[in-house]
Structure formats: structure tokens, C-alpha cells
Amino acid sequence: VYNVPKNSKTPKACRAGGCGVEYTKCQVDLPRLQRKARLYVGIPEKKEEGERFPVLYMHDGHNVFSDEDAFDGVSWGLIQAYRDWPGLPRIIVVGLECANGGRRFDEYAGFPIAHPGLDRFIPKPVGGKGDLYLDTIVSQIKPMIDQNYPTISSPEYTGMVGSSMGGVITHYAALTRTGVFSRFGSLSGAFFVSESSVLHATERATLTGVHKFFLSVGTRECGVGDQEEYVRVNQAVFAALSKKMPPERLRFEIVENGIHHESAWAKVLPSVIRFLFSDIGKGLQHPPAR
């Protein structure tokens, strides 16, 4: 038995059951970030008594589960992924809605952003508030999830995934929060926004607490950077990670014709979940001490 937050609602996309995942959404106050956000939590259906699950935290949470919640009507399709691939590892997925406009760049960057292409969108210095954002997840969101849902709370069973700037903050968490998370995924990471800082920090990090890391980038990315820039900088990040991690724990995929959009990330999502959590297997009856 678990207790969802009192203002939680079950979206239409999952009311009929048979999803493989049942999910709810609620609004939470984030005092450190001085904003409110919707929080989405998906948990496997047909749970056994005493069963507990690994947890995956995802950025841009409104785009994770279904099209009805997504910003432009297209999601990562996590609900559909579990319908199409019922053998995917059974995990709890937590999605936190992002901030609006330039504040998203602030929260999703661990380092100050220095890229001329951003001037078109945000006419002021941004970035560098990633620690504040990650502290919110670690100190507020994760304890709430662990208290109310059947999680396995230890780092070796906890992951984080994001796309674009969400990939940037996920990578930063791999450098700075391995006492909490150990499995990471970055899709179409926009690392060029603070490339030198990202690569320098990666080269200095030990990464001994990183159990798995999945990177992917498309050949037809768009946005602030150009197509070649996305591929080049993701290759550079992969090269830096590969110096620190054994090859079986690191995966890098260049997706032919992959674009910078949720529809493209939805196609990669099953591979991400499978790679990050397949060594754990099904939910555990007797989890490690919490």
C-alpha cells in the first residue's frame, strides 16, 4: 500500500488500465526554485505484495508519459512504450515539469552558459543554477517519492534521464550526485552551451559511482546549435566518459535522421530503459536497507 499526494489525479491516458504503467499527476511547491510544478509518477501495474522498484527521475516531466500532458501534444510516450514492449524493466518513473523560458536554461545548466546562438532566445546571461535544481530533487522530491511509493531508494537502483538541456543537467548530476543516482541517460544533449566547462569537469571527475550511462544524438538535430555541432559535442562527451568508464557500462548511439523532438526521443526511450535497468530485473521482494 502506498499513499499518493492528496491532490493527485489519474490522467485519461491511463484510466482504462492495461498500460503496464499506472500514473498520477499533482502540483508541488518548490521553495528553493521559487515556483510550482506538476509532478508525474508512474508505477508498474499488477504489483505483488512487498514488491519494490528502482526509480528513474526524468526532466521535462510533462512530456514523458502521454500526449495529453505534453507541451505541444507529442510526448516521449512512456505509457505506449510499456504497451509495445511489456518486457521492459519494471521501474517507477518520476517526471518533474520544467520552468518556463530562460529559467529552464538556468535550472538545467550546472555551469554558466556561453553560446552566441542563445542570444536569439534569451538576451541575458543564463545557466549555473543546476545545483539548486538538483538539490530540489534530492532534498524534496526524492524523499517524498521514497516515503509514498514502493521504491528501492539506494543509489545503485536510482537513475536520471533527460533530453536537450535535460541531458546537460543529467550529465552534471553524474559528475556531482553519484551518492544519490548511478544510472544516467542523455538524449540529444545540448552540451555545446557550456562545452569547455562540461568537458573539463568530465575529465576531472572520477565517475566511480556511475553504474550506467546512455548517450544518443540524432543526425538531424536542430535548435540553438546546428546539426554538426550536436553530433560533434556529444562525441566529445562520449570520448571523455569512455576514458573513465568500462565499455560495457557506457553506450553511445548516433541516430540516423534523428531530430530534436519528443517524437524522436520516444523511439529511443525503450533502449534507454532497457540498457540502464536490465541488469536489475524485476521488482525486488527484499530490497537493500533503505
Regions inferred by a protein language model and the residue ranges of each:
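Non-catalytic cap/lid and distal C-terminal segments of serine-dependent acyl enzymes
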Residues: 5-290
